[in-house]
């Protein structure tokens, strides 16, 4: 394989995949909290929460609008790996709510478990409820 041919193509693909979350997205909600700007955007069938769009921050939470229960990010899927060690948890702690996708899926998988969520920013909780269907 000729590295000279593939090198520029690889660079372009990396740059495209690292594009800021704000590229070509429609902002449907924006509010200033005590800690940061909280934004909700929609693009290509996904609704996402992000912070500080002007700094180029990436998405914190995304849901697939066609299938809201599907976990979009690999890291959210990997957060369930610990359950291999304890397949029937009685108590679960989630640090940081985001859009609430992790605790909502946990609630569906483990309806008997006590799930505690730590979130310091009330604006994030409000946005999770209004735009991501989060229910405590």
Region roles according to the model:
Residues 36-39, 47, 51, 69, ...:
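N-terminal, helix-rich and Lys/Arg-enriched segments in bacterial and organellar proteins
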Residues 44-74:
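N-terminal, post-signal-peptide region of Sec/Tat-exported proteins
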């Amino acid at each position: 394989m000729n590295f000279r041919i593939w090198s520029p193509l690889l660079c372009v693909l990396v740059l495209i995949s690292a594009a800021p979350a704000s590229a070509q997205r429609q902002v449907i909600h924006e509010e200033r909290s005590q800690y940061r700007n909280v934004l909700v955007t929609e693009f290509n069938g996904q609704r996402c929460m992000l912070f500080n769009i002007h700094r180029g921050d990436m998405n914190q939470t995304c849901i697939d609008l066609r299938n809201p229960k599907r976990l979009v990010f690999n890291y959210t899927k990997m957060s369930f790996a610990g359950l291999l060690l304890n397949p029937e948890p009685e108590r679960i702690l989630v640090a940081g709510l985001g859009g609430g996708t992790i605790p909502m899926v946990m609630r569906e998988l483990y309806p008997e478990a006590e799930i505690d969520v730590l979130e310091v920013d009330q604006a994030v909780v409000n946005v999770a409820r209004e735009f991501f269907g989060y229910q405590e």
